[in-house]
Amino acid sequence: MTFKEKEAAYLSRWKTTVNEAVWDYCDRHGIRRPNRCTTVQPAGTKSLLTGAAPGWHPPKAQRFIRRITFRKNDPVALACLDYGYSIVPSQSDKDEQGRLLDDPFDSRCTEWLVEIPTEVSWANLPGADQVEINNFSAMAQFDFYMQVQQHYTAHNTSATIEFREHEIESLSEAIHTCIGEGKGYISAALLLSLIHI
């Protein structure tokens, strides 16, 4: 059995387990069964507080600053401030000359960005610092996305595929083939990488 076959079996097993558990719970409590139980689609920036990834794609770094949007004076944002997290005005809050505000307590400020230092779960594993995340090819990312799309989720999987200019043709052919053969492709965000240009 190849790695992809093992991965597909693993994802399918978890999809079945999740569906059976949710349906059993709904049936026991007289609740209508949902039409989607397996999702990879965080809803809003506050879901990121739980450590959820913003989609089914590899992070761009092992450690980074995650900015989460809150309305000004939101109780959770104020709690973050009390715990020492940095708060900056939203990118949409500007002065009369169109310049970004720099004081989150300015009366013109309507939203806050709470800056939370974040690291991926595997950041401190031996050898993790030698993984160059930006070297994943577009086809590797697409394959990773399609495995989850085909064998786990019951709708569109939220994913961003970063590609380089020389990968456009092979990626577009792979997408076209998946659509033509009914393999479950719905959509993915495509982002041109400017790192190697």
What would you call each of these model-derived segments?
Residues K15, P42, L49-I195:
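Catalytic alpha/beta core of large soluble enzyme barrels
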Residues M1-Q41:
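Internal maturation/activation junctions in enzymes
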Residues N35, L48-L49:
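Short capping micro-motif at the N-terminus of alpha-helices
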